[in-house]
Swiss-Prot record:
Amino-acid positions noted as binding anthranilate 2 in the UniProt annotation, renumbered to this chain: 165
Gene: trpD
Binding-site residues for Mg(2+) 1, renumbered to this chain: 91, 224
Cystine bridges: none
Binding site for 5-phospho-alpha-D-ribose 1-diphosphate: 79, 82-83, 87, 89-92, 107-115, 119
Keyword annotations from UniProtKB, A to Z: Amino-acid biosynthesis, Aromatic amino acid biosynthesis, Glycosyltransferase, Magnesium, Metal-binding, Transferase, Tryptophan biosynthesis
A single GO BP: L-tryptophan biosynthetic process
Keyword set includes Iron: no
Species annotation: Vibrio parahaemolyticus serotype O3:K6 (strain RIMD 2210633)
Cited function: Catalyzes the transfer of the phosphoribosyl group of 5-phosphorylribose-1-pyrophosphate (PRPP) to anthranilate to yield N-(5'-phosphoribosyl)-anthranilate (PRA).
Family matches, as Pfam families: Glycos_trans_3N, Glycos_transf_3
Protein name, as recorded: Anthranilate phosphoribosyltransferase
Binding site for anthranilate 1: 79, 110
Family from the record: Belongs to the anthranilate phosphoribosyltransferase family.
């Protein structure tokens, strides 16, 4: 371990195997906190490579509690959080809409990073059981088409890094690992990142982790596909990465200002999301969710973004998406 940490002190990048060894020891609680802080700082200052991120993610997945993985195509739709904009819970809402459009979604989530209400806070308010067993969660994906895996239930080892992360008060590699360590191991993923600089490296990381089809996005300051500006995309298909940009017009929608999709506390968000999922939200709110669902649908082979967007809006207007919230709450 000394050799690995010394390599970081010399600003040398680790191999994927070395990174996996380092994070394996961190997750097992076997690395001295001072050394852990040094290693995380050295990685941050050097800039984490796709190899290092993939190695860390593999270590966390190897140490995670097991989940009975479906053998069909299924996805995660998730953002890193930490974009600082406190928007409504777009990816959580989009998960229900995507399921209403016939996709299978197993969403990995945690308490909030930057918004006043993270995905788990919102789900809690709808009466959805976050402590659902892995078997029940899997059954929900099978039967309802959507379920949520609450990170602390599967990744207990992350607690060993918590005191160091809280003391450091800065972003570390852990801030980007969450979306990469879904214990259900989806083969399709739409992942939003808080910085445009991360789009390509995270796509390269996903490629190394064997993702079948995925897109990494940053939307004009947001860790989502944007309704207020352009979105930078790195898409994985057939083992290759293609980079492109999207605008609201590509989805057949007008753009709306960022203020139009601001969120609130969990209770306010619950009211907003209920309106969206029953088609009573504003055009901006429905559009913000629909563009994310539309890109996720593309990853399942439905290439026409405009048609996908209309299908997503219809799933909200019909109330079908909200019915899935009620079914998931009853499932527990």
């Amino acid at each position: 371990m000394e050799a690995i940490i010394n390599k970081l002190y010399e600003q040398q990048s680790l191999t994927q195997e070395e990174s996996q060894q380092l994070f394996d020891i961190i997750i097992r609680g076997e690395l001295d906190p001072i050394l852990m802080a040094s290693a995380l700082t050295a990685l941050k200052i050097k800039g984490e490579t796709p190899d290092e991120i993939a190695g860390a993610a593999k270590a966390l997945l190897a140490n995670a509690n097991p989940f009975p993985r479906p053998d069909y195509d299924f996805a995660d739709i998730v953002g890193t959080g930490g974009d600082g904009h406190n928007t409504i819970n777009i990816s959580t809402t989009a998960a229900f809409v995507a399921a209403a459009c016939g996709l299978k979604v197993a969403k990995h989530g945690n308490r909030s990073v930057s918004s006043k209400s993270g995905s788990s806070d919102l789900l809690d308010s709808f009466g959805i059981n976050l402590a659902m067993s892995a078997e029940d969660t899997r059954k929900a994906v099978d039967d309802i088409g959507v379920a949520f895996l609450f990170a602390p239930q599967y990744h207990g080892g992350v607690r060993h890094a918590m005191p160091v992360r809280q003391t450091m008060k800065t972003r570390t590699i852990f801030n980007i690992l969450g979306p990469l360590i879904n214990p259900a191991r989806p083969n399709i993923e739409l992942m939003g990142v808080y910085s445009e600089e991360l789009v390509r490296p995270i796509a390269e990381t996903m490629l190394q982790m064997g993702m079948k089809r995925a897109a990494v996005v940053h939307g004009s300051g947001l860790d989502e596909v944007a309704i207020h500006g352009t979105t930078t995309v790195a898409e994985i298909k057939d083992g290759k990465i293609t980079e492109y940009t999207l605008t609201p017009e590509d989805f057949g929608l007008e753009s709306h200002p960022l203020e139009a999709i601001k969120g609130g506390d969990p209770e306010e968000n619950k009211a907003i999301i209920t309106n969206i999922l029953t088609g009573k939200g504003t055009d901006a709110q429905l559009g913000a969710v629909a563009v994310n669902v539309a890109l996720l649908m593309r990853l399942f082979g439905h290439e026409d973004l405009k048609a996908n967007t209309q299908q997503a809006i219809e799933a909200m207007n019909s109330g079908k998406a909200y019915q899935l919230v009620q079914q998931l709450a009853a499932h527990a």
